[in-house]
């Protein structure tokens, strides 16, 4: 298969305690807000996938149902630390390096290094 695959993830829905504070967190780490009302926030990731934040009861101490990838993991780790977040130490794996950070709802989000170079 040449070029991009013909399918991709369109939306991921996350139940949150507070849509406003959650949207602020995700915007702060680099997502673009594309829709907002009192009951939902839609944020766009690179590649066009949308994270949809809706009121809900997030499970205590849960992993987010997705992970994110960034171009420069070390730079991202430092930048998020400077924002006052508390990223875990970076772990260097065989395929990815990664760290975790908690969002305002307690979801543990894994942040991976990218293994793709160039536009995706």
Predicted regions and their residues:
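A generic local structural motif
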Residues: 1, 28-29, 53-55, 86-87
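Vicinal oxygen chelate
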Residues: 1-5, 8-17, 41, 57-120
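Core segments of cupin and vicinal oxygen chelate
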Residues: 6-7, 13-50
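Conserved short beta-strand elements that form part of the metal-binding/catalytic scaffold
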Residues: 32-64, 108-114
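Residue-level signal for secondary-structure boundary sites
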Residues: 51, 74-76, 119
């Amino acid at each position: 298969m040449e070029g991009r695959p013909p399918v991709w993830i369109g939306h991921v829905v996350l139940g949150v305690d507070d849509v406003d504070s959650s949207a602020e967190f995700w915007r702060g780490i680099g997502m673009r807000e594309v829709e907002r009302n009192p009951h939902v926030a839609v944020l766009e990731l690179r590649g066009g996938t949308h994270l949809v934040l809706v009121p809900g009861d997030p499970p205590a101490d849960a992993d987010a149902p997705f992970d994110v990838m960034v171009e420069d993991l070390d730079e991202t780790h430092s930048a998020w630390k400077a924002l006052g977040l508390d990223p875990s130490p970076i772990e260097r794996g065989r395929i990815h390096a990664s760290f975790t950070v908690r969002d305002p709802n307690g979801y543990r989000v894994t942040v991976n290094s990218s293994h793709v170079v160039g536009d995706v």
